[in-house]
Amino acid sequence: MKLSVPETISNPRDFLHTSVPQLTDLDSLLRCHICKDFLKASVLTPCGHSFCSICIRKYLQKESKCPLCLSDLTESMLQKEFLVQEICSSYVKLRGSLQKHLTISSQEEEKDNEIIISDEADTSVGTKRGTPDSPSLSSVSTKKRKHDGITTLLMKKKTDHPQRQEKKAQCPICSKHLPLSELEGSHIDECLNKGSSLERSDSFEILDERTPSPSMESSHQPLEEKTSLPSSHLLEVKEKKDITYHNERYLNSGLLQQKENRLPRLDFQSLSMTQLKQKLASLALPSNGTKQQMVARYKHYEMLWNSNFLDSIDPVDENELKRRLSSWEAKHNTDHSSDSNSITNLLRGNKRTNAISAMIKLFKSDRFDRKGWMRHHTSTFKALKLEAQRSDKLAKMKKEELSQKSDANSEVSSEPILKIDQTSENN
């Protein structure tokens, strides 16, 4: 009796042997982690994980916890995800075409898997490489062997090229950048011998050590497994991690601990200007402008804060949030953006105070940077100089005004005396 087996069983690893192996990550993300098939009627949990509706409901009948992060979960907490469902359905329709167009053809695969193993005889010291009558060329015997699996991404048929300027490439085993001549020599064999005792993952297994044929063992000449290693055809260690980076980050998202609390909404009608300014100051935000502008500033920062620290899988720090707020305020809340209390100036001020405090620590030592101190305070010195010149001018102007007034008063006071003298003479 034969069991009925589906004709095709899809697997995220189907894309490992294509020209875009990173699609493995996308394929895994669109699958339910209970049934391992593509999401159907996707629902979202409060902890941010997606499952098929029927799968998670069956699971919750046995245990009231999220299968991935073990957070408390009930059916009433599940939310519909129409967008994810449509994305998944669209991908399922395109998956076959993607795999067909991106899969490397069998002929190219055979060419890429071929390794030329050359057995070179020892030559005399004076013999030059590449001469027509060189004994090494006559004693070379080649044998082609095929590798399967992930090695299609690691190996390429060796072609004879004239010797050019020495180039470097990255070793797929130890990830070191070495000259091609060294990599084509015994370096890879040494790396494989060292790493043969280490455990390797099923998805990214590097070349297995192969035992040479008896005919090759009989000749007491060194064997060299040669392969050209251009960086464009190597699956580097970084790229291997990138293939499953998003999927692993999603699976580990439940382990992330929420460090920051939710920023609450405020009842702005009941808050006075003083209370609102105190609230902004407690968040290290500027408290300038009208009440309407301060309310808009707080609302936008509240939105940035909660979406970053509560919903993002990769949150940024507070300084980045304040930079985003500054950018938003420059476009939508510009009346007081140039004030000394604006966000941009506050951020700049923090950097300046840090630099000044570092200088002050060295003020009494020989390491004090006097020129740096002068450069840092050049604008302040200029402002003080201009202010002193203005005050000097004002003082001179006041003196002149006072002297002019005193002269005018003396002239006015002398006129009645002259009149009195004239009247006395007439009498």
Swiss-Prot record:
Keywords attached to this entry: DNA damage, DNA repair, DNA-binding, Metal-binding, Nucleus, Transferase, Ubl conjugation pathway, Zinc, Zinc-finger
Annotated localization: Nucleus
Substrates-to-products reaction catalysed: S-ubiquitinyl-[E2 ubiquitin-conjugating enzyme]-L-cysteine + [acceptor protein]-L-lysine = [E2 ubiquitin-conjugating enzyme]-L-cysteine + N(6)-ubiquitinyl-[acceptor protein]-L-lysine
Family matches, as PROSITE patterns: SAP, ZF_RING_1, ZF_RING_2, ZF_UBZ4
MF term (GO), any: zinc ion binding
Pathway: Protein modification; protein ubiquitination
Annotated disulfide bonds: none
SUPFAM superfamilies: RING/U-box (SSF57850)
The protein's Enzyme Commission number: 2.3.2.27
Binding-site residues, Zn(2+): 171, 174, 187, 191
Record has RNA-binding as a keyword: no
GO CC entries: nucleus; Rad6-Rad18 complex
Segments of this protein annotated with the region Disordered: 113-170, 202-228, 392-427
Alphabetized InterPro entries for the sequence: Rad18, Rad18_fungi, Rad18_UBZ4, SAP_dom, Znf_RING, Znf_RING/FYVE/PHD, Znf_RING_CS
Ranges of Acidic residues composition bias in the record: 113-122
UniProt xrefs under Pfam families: SAP, zf-C3HC4_2
Zinc-finger ranges (UBZ4-type): 168-196
Family according to the record: Belongs to the RAD18 family.
Subunit structure of this chain's protein: Interacts with E2 UBC2, forming a complex with ubiquitin ligase activity.
Protein's UniProt name: Postreplication repair E3 ubiquitin-protein ligase RAD18
Organism of this sequence: Kluyveromyces lactis (strain ATCC 8585 / CBS 2359 / DSM 70799 / NBRC 1267 / NRRL Y-1140 / WM37)
